[in-house]
């Protein structure tokens, strides 16, 4: 099944999904989504037999954003330090964004040196970076639901003082996030489709008429344009 919706509003998505029929909707066993609360309530409303799984990559993105925000805030902190420590912190943080966010095992030798400088200058960023790496590893290495759930609980305890916003969100979505350890489902395919849709929009210099865009998108994937609403 494929559905293209003109808006992200819940009622618009529901209208399209309702056209699939109750029989199809009742047979959906799992829905992978990002951390959007309205969509979760919609799934519960129209897909009674579906389990919701949060895409692990959206959760990881949230961690990255909070780490980067802490990096930016450290620049503000540096202004109130003495000249020597201020220069050390500023110099280490300059150009450090992608070094901090990229998986440590994938860093170049130069980036490893930069990471060492940042950790030396900012104990807080050092801890947050370590927690970021641990968070990534628990999704990569947990063999089953039990192990993944226990490791995530342990991570939440250690991270509560550093990733306050993320910890609150993960706690609120705990069941849906830990569902990944059991089913290993992500939105990877959908994200790939979205990237192609963005490319299509660029090639078409934008589409003012949604029906024209819908037909072009269906033809792009070799679906008959008769599927368009």
Regions found by a protein language model. Name each.
Residues 1-11:
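Glycine-rich phosphate-binding "P-loop"
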């Amino acid at each position: 099944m494929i559905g293209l919706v003109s808006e992200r509003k819940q009622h618009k998505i529901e209208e399209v999904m309702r056209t699939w029929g109750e029989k199809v909707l009742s047979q959906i066993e799992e829905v992978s989504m990002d951390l959007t609360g309205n969509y979760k309530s919609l799934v519960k409303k129209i897909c009674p037999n579906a389990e919701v799984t949060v895409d692990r990559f959206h959760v990881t993105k949230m961690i990255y954003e909070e780490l980067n925000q802490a990096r930016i805030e450290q620049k503000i902190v540096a202004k109130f330090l003495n000249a020597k420590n201020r220069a050390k912190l500023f110099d280490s943080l300059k150009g450090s964004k992608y070094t901090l966010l990229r998986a440590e095992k994938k860093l170049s030798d130069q980036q490893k040196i930069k990471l060492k400088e940042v950790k030396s200058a900012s104990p807080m960023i050092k801890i947050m970076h370590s927690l970021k790496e641990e968070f990534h590893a628990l999704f990569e290495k947990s063999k089953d639901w039990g192990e993944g759930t226990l490791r995530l609980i342990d991570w939440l305890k250690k991270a509560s003082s550093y990733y306050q916003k993320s910890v609150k969100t993960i706690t609120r979505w705990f069941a849906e996030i830990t569902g990944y350890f059991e089913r290993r489902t992500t939105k990877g395919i959908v994200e790939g489709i979205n990237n192609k849709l963005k490319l299509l929009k660029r090639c078409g210099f934008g589409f003012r008429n949604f029906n024209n865009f819908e037909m072009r998108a269906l033809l792009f994937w070799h679906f008959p344009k008769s599927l368009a609403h």
